[in-house]
Amino acid sequence: MKNVLSIQSHVVFGYAGNKSATFPMQLMGVDVWALNTVQFSNHTQYGKWTGMVIPKEQIGEIIRGIDEIGELKNCNAVVSGYLGSAEQVDEIIKAVEKVKSLNPQALYLCDPVMGHPDKGCIVADGVKEGLINLAVSHADILTPNLVELREISGLPVENFEQAIEAVKVIRAKGPKTVLIKHLSKVGKYADKFEMLLANDEGIWHLTRPLYTFAKEPVGVGDLTAGLFLANKVNGKSDLEAFEHMANAVNEVMKTTFELNSYELQLIAARKLIVNPVSSVKAVKIA
């Protein structure tokens, strides 16, 4: 069994961060070591929440504790997502470096959550800069959305062609694999959900159904990153991981839409996450 250290947010009610990523990865046969960066009552897009940011020192202490019992060497990958403070970036990179020193084959997937004020997603001051200046260069896999693609590349991304160029710029910064979670308004089709995957072998474009929610569910990016990484540690190629993830996420979104829910319906879709009925394929474009 493969082991993934998942350093993300935690919500008591609903699904975001580790609550979105852990169960689906476990369904894929991966043992998840969930380390929370915040503990909130609910995700921030409700507009109000209670809870706390986990002190940065606790991240290092917990990693050290796992190492002291001799288990850190068995970590196959690290994923980081929503961070509660800029200082946590440093602690996460220290954790990544420690894991890789013990297991040089371990992967680091950075989901560079930088906030989306228009959607009510708020991150602390300095997190964006820490991700850009430190985390990106350490990542083997980077999974930005459109906003993060612009911020990390430093380029305007107003159309599909510019998105491709921005991906190339980001790959030159260190990540071998870049997965754009949602092309949004720069995609080719207004009525589809579109994603990109880029690595040394080329660039792939994938479309899946787009569901129109009254309120967009949160945690889809966390689910996306988690499922992609679970497939990778299980030995799948980037393309295989990309296609399975896209189909599994589509099943979750379809189920959530049919149940008219604001929160992702992971439990209702649990069998479809492992064995999706959906069968969309990626198309190589470069």
From Swiss-Prot:
GO terms for cellular component: cytosol. InterPro entries: PM/HMP-P_kinase-1, PyrdxlKinase, Pyridoxal_kinase_PdxY, Ribokinase-like. Keywords: ATP-binding, Kinase, Magnesium, Nucleotide-binding, Transferase. It is an enzyme of class 2 (transferase). Its EC number is 2.7.1.35. The keyword ATP-binding applies. It catalyses: pyridoxal + ATP = pyridoxal 5'-phosphate + ADP + H(+). ATP binds at residues 111, 148, 181. Substrate binds at residues 9, 44-45, 222. Pathway: Cofactor metabolism; pyridoxal 5'-phosphate salvage; pyridoxal 5'-phosphate from pyridoxal: step 1/1. GO terms for molecular function: ATP binding; magnesium ion binding; pyridoxal kinase activity. GO terms for biological process: pyridoxal 5'-phosphate salvage. Its cofactor is Mg(2+). NCBIfam families: PRK05756.1, pyridox_kin. HAMAP family: PdxY (MF_01639). Homodimer. Belongs to the pyridoxine kinase family. PdxY subfamily. Pyridoxal kinase involved in the salvage pathway of pyridoxal 5'-phosphate (PLP). Catalyzes the phosphorylation of pyridoxal to PLP. This is Pyridoxal kinase PdxY. It comes from Mannheimia succiniciproducens (strain KCTC 0769BP / MBEL55E). The gene is pdxY.
